[in-house]
């Protein structure tokens, strides 16, 4: 049987998953996206060339890797066409290697209109979504009024589904949110055209994955966002609309629990968050700005500045437990170069008591004050180092402390954005 590895974020997203997925896709059978949409922004740097992927799995830059989009992903037709076009214009063969589940829901124009109108109406209480229709598309999926890839090939059924959806959503858009209605004919024509475009890529993703496992091929499941943004286990309501944790890899592709052999959790050597929501270790000072500048902490999808803070072990341990993480990958170690001292949150002060467990609600998180452990920094340059023994003593001590505090071994350390700026201490596929 083949080996399957799930790669997922162990913080609030933007941990560097795309680079690690690309690194691990050498000699791979397939890479599969299992949740989220084009709100994800996976940045790859290979030989100094930067590529940002939003929907297509990060294995697309490997010539022999099959790339799959599972039923758990919500697909924007316009975003997918644009991304395929950009890659193919750069000489990357996409359509012959990309397979998409017919059960994947579509992000329709009314989902985008709803998302943006709601955020505007919420004002200061906005969640901080990307405004790309992800949440409303998942809402329709659960409400059983979603339009899926499979529906595009039955025009009469598609027309009925679309009219029903627009009757509902246009009422909300015009009567409640006070914005313009979405036009039926334009939306219908665009959907039919996309159906023709995507037809050659439509495939039974679950069946492909089962066959690959029987053939002994390696499969990598690529998560988007991070565990602490999970719709069920994150800082609700400041979360994304899908299951970003390991359970999402199963439900979002159609494989069983026995198909997962290793879970790799990606975490930065510090912490970041985009948008609203609790962030106990956030640094609203020159230290936080320094990390933001050195780490280029601006969203790949939105360009928004990310909130920056110290490593939060309480939150990381929660991600390790929820996902059954087998090993950690610590990224952006080099961003901490030159800092005199580092802090790691090892517990919270919560309502007068010390706790090593995170509250289960956003309000509780907001009331938490971090308890820090200090570590000496290092002045040496770690950028691009690929051997453990060549890291500064203080950097090695910091990593070993993270490993011990999180109760999980570190498998990979990243010291720069390029694929080659990486040291693999334990191969997840070994």
UniProtKB/Swiss-Prot annotation:
Substrate binds at residues 300-306. GTP binds at residues 13-19, 41-43, 306, 332-334, 414-416. IMP binds at residues 14-17, 39-42, 130, 144, 225, 240, 304. The keyword Transcription does not apply. Its EC number is 6.3.4.4. It is found in: Cytoplasm. Mg(2+) binds at residues 14, 41. Gene3D superfamilies: Adenylosuccinate Synthetase, subunit A, domain 1 (3.40.440.10), Adenylosuccinate Synthetase, subunit A, domain 2 (1.10.300.10), Adenylosuccinate Synthetase, subunit A, domain 3 (3.90.170.10). One of its GO terms (cellular component) is cytoplasm. CDD domains: AdSS (cd03108). Keywords: Cytoplasm, GTP-binding, Ligase, Magnesium, Metal-binding, Nucleotide-binding, Purine biosynthesis. It catalyses: IMP + L-aspartate + GTP = N(6)-(1,2-dicarboxyethyl)-AMP + GDP + phosphate + 2 H(+). Binds 1 Mg(2+) ion per subunit. SUPFAM superfamilies: P-loop containing nucleoside triphosphate hydrolases. GO terms for biological process: 'de novo' AMP biosynthetic process; IMP metabolic process. It is an enzyme of class 6 (ligase). Homodimer. Plays an important role in the de novo pathway of purine nucleotide biosynthesis. Catalyzes the first committed step in the biosynthesis of AMP from IMP. NCBIfam families: PRK01117.1, purA. This is Adenylosuccinate synthetase.
């Amino acid at each position: 049987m083949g080996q399957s590895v799930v790669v997922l974020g162990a913080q609030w997203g933007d941990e560097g998953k795309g680079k690690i997925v690309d690194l691990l896709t050498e000699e791979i059978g397939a890479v599969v996206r299992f949740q989220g949409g084009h709100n994800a922004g996976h940045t790859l740097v290979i030989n100094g060339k930067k590529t940002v992927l939003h929907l297509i799995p990060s294995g697309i830059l490997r010539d022999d890797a099959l790339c799959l989009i599972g039923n758990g992903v919500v697909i924007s037709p316009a975003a997918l066409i644009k991304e395929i076009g950009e890659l193919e214009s750069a000489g990357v063969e996409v359509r012959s290697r990309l397979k998409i589940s017919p059960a994947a829901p579509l992000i329709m124009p009314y989902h985008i209109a709803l998302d943006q109108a709601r955020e505007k109406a919420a004002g200061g209480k906005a969640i901080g979504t990307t405004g790309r229709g992800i949440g409303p598309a998942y809402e329709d999926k659960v409400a059983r009024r979603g339009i899926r890839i499979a529906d595009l090939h039955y025009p009469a059924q598609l027309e009925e589904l679309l009219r029903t959806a627009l009757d509902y959503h246009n009422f909300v858009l015009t009567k409640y949110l006070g914005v313009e209605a979405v036009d039926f004919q334009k939306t219908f024509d665009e959907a039919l055209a996309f159906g023709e475009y995507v037809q050659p890529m439509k495939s039974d993703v679950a069946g492909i994955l089962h066959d690959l496992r029987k053939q002994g091929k390696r499969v990598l499941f690529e998560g988007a966002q991070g565990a602490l943004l999970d719709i069920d286990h994150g800082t609700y309501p400041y979360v994304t609309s899908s299951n970003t944790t390991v359970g999402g890899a199963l439900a979002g592709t159609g494989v069983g629990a026995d198909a997962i052999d290793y879970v790799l959790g990606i975490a930065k050597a510090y912490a970041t968050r985009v948008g609203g929501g609790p962030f106990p270790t956030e640094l609203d000072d020159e230290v936080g700005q320094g990390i933001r500048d050195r780490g280029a902490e601006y969203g790949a999808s939105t360009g928004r500045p990310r909130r920056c803070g110290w490593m939060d072990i309480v939150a990381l341990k929660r991600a390790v437990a929820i996902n059954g993480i087998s090993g950690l990958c610590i990224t952006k170690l080099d961003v901490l170069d030159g800092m005199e001292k580092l802090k790691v949150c090892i517990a919270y002060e919560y309502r007068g008591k010390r706790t090593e467990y995170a509250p289960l609600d956003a309000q509780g998180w907001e009331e938490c004050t971090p308890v820090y452990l200090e570590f000496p920094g290092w002045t040496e340059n770690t950028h691009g180092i690929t051997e453990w023994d060549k890291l500064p003593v203080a950097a090695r001590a910091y990593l070993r402390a993270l490993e011990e505090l999180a109760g999980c071994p570190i498998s990979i350390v990243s010291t720069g954005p390029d694929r080659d700026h990486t040291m693999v201490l334990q191969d997840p596929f070994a």
